[in-house]
Amino acid sequence: MAGLTQSPSPPAPSLLSAQTEGGEFVESLGFNGTLLAQMFNFLVLLILLRAVAYKPFMNMLEKRRELIEGSIAAAEEDKKQAEQLRATLQADLQRSREQATEMMARATKNAEEQAQQIIEAAKAEAARVKDSALSEIQREKERAVAELRDQVATLSILVAGKIIDQKLNDDVQKDLVNKFVKEAGDLPC
């Protein structure tokens, strides 16, 4: 109230009449009429300010508060959605890692199985080649033994013919050859 100054304008007619008529009464109570008029003016100004400035200002503040609360709620909702998206992406990433690990394990297992199959096939081929070679060697051995028997028989006949220096008949000659071949067949080769 110290900042309020007294206006040089004359008091309003209603106040003037109240001052003149009841001015003595008010003054007898120890009140100054000017002070009462200033209080009345302040109340009127307060009511006008409330109607004109305070309510729009408060409405603006309320709208601003609602806007801020809405922004905070939207930010919290966005944060929740971002958190859900992050969790989903994290789960997808983990699932992808597990699938990649599983694929690598399967590929390694398949490669090991193929390597084992190749080794087994090579062993089987080596065994087949070995068996074939052994069979061929056995056939060659048998053929060589048969040729050797034939040559031994022929040589035996020639040697026997020269030793005996006589001509044997065919039956005796065959018996001698067969006996010699049989004895030669029992020899270790």
Swiss-Prot record:
Cellular localization per UniProt: Cell membrane
Recorded GO MF terms: proton-transporting ATP synthase activity, rotational mechanism; proton-transporting ATPase activity, rotational mechanism
InterPro entries: ATP_synth_B-like_membr_sf, ATP_synth_b/b'su_bac/chlpt, ATP_synth_F0_bsu_bac, ATP_synthase_B_chain
Main location: membrane
Pfam families membership: ATP-synt_B
Chain ranges passing through the membrane: 35-54
Repeat among keywords: no
Membrane topology per record: Single-pass membrane protein
Cellular component annotations (GO), alphabetically ordered: plasma membrane; proton-transporting ATP synthase complex
Keywords: ATP synthesis, Cell membrane, CF(0), Hydrogen ion transport, Ion transport, Membrane, Transmembrane, Transmembrane helix, Transport
HAMAP family assigned: ATP_synth_b_bprime
Protein purpose: F(1)F(0) ATP synthase produces ATP from ADP in the presence of a proton or sodium gradient. F-type ATPases consist of two structural domains, F(1) containing the extramembraneous catalytic core and F(0) containing the membrane proton channel, linked together by a central stalk and a peripheral stalk. During catalysis, ATP synthesis in the catalytic domain of F(1) is coupled via a rotary mechanism of the central stalk subunits to proton translocation.
NCBIfam families the UniProt entry points to: ATP_synt_b
Family of the protein in this entry: Belongs to the ATPase B chain family.
Subunit: F-type ATPases have 2 components, F(1) - the catalytic core - and F(0) - the membrane proton channel. F(1) has five subunits: alpha(3), beta(3), gamma(1), delta(1), epsilon(1). F(0) has three main subunits: a(1), b(2) and c(10-14). The alpha and beta chains form an alternating ring which encloses part of the gamma chain. F(1) is attached to F(0) by a central stalk formed by the gamma and epsilon chains, while a peripheral stalk is formed by the delta and b chains.
Name of the molecule in the record: ATP synthase subunit b
